[in-house]
């Protein structure tokens, strides 16, 4: 198992959930945390513990976004009109790495970040190598020509474990996608329950 996979699956083990719905997740076989004390029965979490866990799970899902970056997204969410929890999800789903993953150009969130860093992705015809780049409705995303036949891309296109959500219009023949609309929480195909309202409560303490 690569170091990248070890880090990814460590998140699953720590949460005790298969947060991406991957067939090879270790929690499909055992539902306890990593380490020698992982099998101990966990007591009931406090409100703070529940809120913290919700934050860790959402951060982990989006390829372990740093606390600094995640908090900045939260602050932006609170400044937008409407429900802050919904806004938080909308902003996370507008990230280029998220959309590259949702469009099934790569197999994992972690791979999306690396794929973009290595210059394989264009937005509106221009190469973008910033995973956190914030997309607008109508933006066109494309795998650059030299990368369209990479095994990583072709294998991701065929993944049966997840579908492209309807807020992204993907064409795997051309390896292009369009960001159609900003999704609500209910639109996002999370494999496990996410609770952004608890994250709002956590930061509002």
UniProtKB/Swiss-Prot annotation:
Keywords, alphabetical: Ribonucleoprotein, Ribosomal protein, RNA-binding, rRNA-binding
UniProt cross-references to SMART domains, sorted A to Z: Ribosomal_S4, S4
Subunit composition and interactions: Part of the 30S ribosomal subunit. Contacts protein S5. The interaction surface between S4 and S5 is involved in control of translational fidelity.
GO cellular component terms listed in the entry, alphabetical order: small ribosomal subunit
Family: Belongs to the universal ribosomal protein uS4 family.
Annotated NCBIfam families: PRK05327.1, rpsD_bact
Gene3D superfamilies, per database record: Ribosomal Protein S4 Delta 41, Chain A, domain 1 (1.10.1050.10), RNA-binding S4 domain (3.10.290.10)
Summary of the function given for this chain in its UniProt record: One of the primary rRNA binding proteins, it binds directly to 16S rRNA where it nucleates assembly of the body of the 30S subunit. With S5 and S12 plays an important role in translational accuracy.
Residue ranges of the region described as Disordered: 18-49
InterPro entries xref list: Ribosomal_uS4, Ribosomal_uS4_bac-type, Ribosomal_uS4_CS, Ribosomal_uS4_N, S4_RNA-bd, S4_RNA-bd_sf
Protein name: Small ribosomal subunit protein uS4
Domain S4 RNA-binding: 94-157
Keyword Ribosomal protein: yes
Keyword Ribonucleoprotein: yes
The species this protein was found in: Nitrobacter hamburgensis (strain DSM 10229 / NCIMB 13809 / X14)
PANTHER family reported in the protein's UniProt record: 30S 40S RIBOSOMAL PROTEIN, SMALL RIBOSOMAL SUBUNIT PROTEIN US4M
GO biological process: ribosomal small subunit biogenesis; translation
Pfam families in UniProt: Ribosomal_S4, S4
Residues that span the membrane, as ranges: none
Classification via HAMAP family: Ribosomal_uS4_B
GO MF entry, a single one: rRNA binding
């Amino acid at each position: 198992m690569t170091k990248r996979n070890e880090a990814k699956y460590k998140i699953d083990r720590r949460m005790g959930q298969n947060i991406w719905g991957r067939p090879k997740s270790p929690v499909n076989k055992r539902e306890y945390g990593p380490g020698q004390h992982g099998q101990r029965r966990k007591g009931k979490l406090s409100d703070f513990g529940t809120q913290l866990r919700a934050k860790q799970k959402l951060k982990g899902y989006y390829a372990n976004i740093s606390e600094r970056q995640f908090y900045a997204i939260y602050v932006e969410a609170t400044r937008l009109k409407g429900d802050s929890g919904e806004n938080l999800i909308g902003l996370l789903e507008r990230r280029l790495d998220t959309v590259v993953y949702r469009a099934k150009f790569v197999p994992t969130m972690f791979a999306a970040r690396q794929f973009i860093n290595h210059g394989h992705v264009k937005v509106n015809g221009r190469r973008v190598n910033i995973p956190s780049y914030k997309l607008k409705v109508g933006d066109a995303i494309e795998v650059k020509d030299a990368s369209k036949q990479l095994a990583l891309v072709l294998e991701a296109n065929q993944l049966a474990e997840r579908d492209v959500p309807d807020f992204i219009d993907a064409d795997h023949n051309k390896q292009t996608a369009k960001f159609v609309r900003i999704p609500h929480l209910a639109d996002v195909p999370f494999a496990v329950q996410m609770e952004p309202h608890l994250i709002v409560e956590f930061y509002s303490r």
